[in-house]
């Protein structure tokens, strides 16, 4: 793959991106974060992180000491899953391989955070049915799309609106997964309440039609997410917990900016986090998906919601904020964003194709193009074989 054409890199060495910052108990050397990136290389059965490639992949991207690495979405339990090749962290065999991955990251003097993931209606009902599992959702009055509704009918596994007992079990599963993460050597966990997955489905009035204490009002829709937050604060400590949100996201049939109450909903969540912070329980960070990318399945520049901004979060939440969404090709925007001393920047797809991304950002070097066709394939190709800048020059990529 050649370098990205038409891109004029700018060195960010003299910006706050290369100032240290403390996240929880970890002292980062810079603020360029590797965010969660689903890669579908785990082995089935068992949802086990890939024993051959995963530690190599993460170690390559942790090569700059002091880098914050947030893992790909990781299932907290079989019931939370439904993708055969995404990893989990509920079993001893999974934990054993995560230990190797975290060791590879720590050997580079970088830091490992595990994203804890529950799919909800974004899962595959036929895969769940095969394994004797429910097709869970916030409320069964609406499906994510017609295709999944048909799959659910064909598999005789219709949507199941979580009962209060189900919610309690999910919280127990989050606790178990968080404990396993720390026991395996992770520095912390990120609760995934974004991009249309289960916790996000409770936050959004399009997917949440409940009439009990988990639906109907802003406070009720936020209840499940905040109960998970509180459970993990008590289990592993607030300094080891972060939360990811996507206020303007439309992925997996979320409302995004079309919902008039979206700012009010997320302002409430952030306000509740700040209340906990003032009581001595400040989370390590909040991670926001930008309206620059409302749907991560689209290419850069597509799907931007130009009528919204996440700037509102800064007046409510006073802790660190990771901002992610189409920043790699826009260093001039990063230069402005990181003027705020609490801001970190998440770089997704270009961290896939540039294992030495932090070095390239610092020096203002060209970026390797990524190959989207290898994002989710069971292969080392497009996973561990992207070259560093020096290797790419040796390959002649700078001449293509």
Curated annotation (Swiss-Prot):
Listed GO biological process terms: apoptotic process
Domain of life, source organism: Eukaryota
CDD domains for this protein: OYE_like_FMN
Residues noted as binding substrate in the record, renumbered to the chain: 192, 195, 376
EC number: 1.6.99.1
Keyword field contains Oxidoreductase: yes
Reported cofactor(s): FMN
Protein name stated in the entry: NADPH dehydrogenase 3
Name of the gene this protein is made from: OYE3
């Amino acid at each position: 793959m050649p370098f990205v054409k038409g891109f004029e890199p700018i060195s960010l060495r003299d910006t706050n991106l290369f100032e240290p910052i403390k996240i929880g108990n970890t002292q980062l050397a810079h603020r360029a974060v590797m965010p969660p990136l689903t890669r579908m290389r785990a082995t089935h059965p068992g949802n086990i992180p890939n024993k051959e490639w995963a530690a190599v992949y993460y170690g390559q991207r942790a090569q700059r000491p002091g880098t914050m690495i947030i893992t790909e979405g990781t299932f907290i339990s079989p019931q939370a899953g439904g993708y055969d090749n995404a990893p989990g962290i509920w079993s001893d065999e999974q934990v054993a391989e995560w230990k190797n991955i975290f060791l590879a990251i720590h050997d580079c003097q970088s830091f490992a955070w595990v994203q804890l993931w529950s799919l909800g209606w974004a899962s595959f009902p036929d895969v769940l049915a095969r394994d004797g599992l429910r097709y869970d959702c916030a409320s069964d009055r609406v499906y994510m799309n017609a295709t999944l509704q048909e799959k659910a009918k064909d598999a005789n596994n219709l949507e199941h609106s979580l009962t209060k007992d189900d919610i309690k079990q999910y919280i127990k599963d989050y606790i178990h997964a968080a404990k396993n993460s720390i026991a395996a050597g992770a520095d912390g966990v990120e609760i995934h309440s974004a991009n249309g997955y289960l916790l996000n489905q409770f936050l959004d009035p399009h997917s949440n039609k409940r009439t009990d204490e988990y639906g109907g009002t802003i406070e009720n829709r936020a209840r499940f997410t905040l109960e998970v937050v509180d459970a993990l604060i008590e289990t592993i400590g607030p300094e080891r917990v972060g939360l990811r949100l996507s206020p303007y996201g439309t992925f997996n049939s979320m409302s995004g900016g079309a919902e008039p109450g979206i700012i009010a909903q997320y302002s409430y969540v952030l306000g509740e986090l700040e209340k906990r912070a003032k009581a001595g329980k400040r989370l390590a960070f909040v991670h926001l998906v930008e309206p620059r990318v409302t749907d991560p399945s689209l290419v850069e520049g597509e799907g931007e919601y130009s009528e919204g901004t996440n700037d509102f979060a800064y007046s409510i939440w006073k802790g660190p904020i990771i901002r992610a969404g189409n920043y790699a090709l826009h260093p001039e925007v990063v230069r402005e964003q990181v003027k705020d001393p609490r801001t970190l920047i998440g770089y997704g797809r270009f961290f896939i194709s540039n294992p030495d991304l932090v070095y390239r950002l610092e020096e203002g070097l060209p970026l390797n193009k990524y190959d989207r066709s290898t994002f989710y394939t069971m292969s080392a190709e497009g996973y561990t074989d992207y070259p560093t800048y020096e290797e790419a020059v040796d390959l002649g990529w700078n001449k293509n």
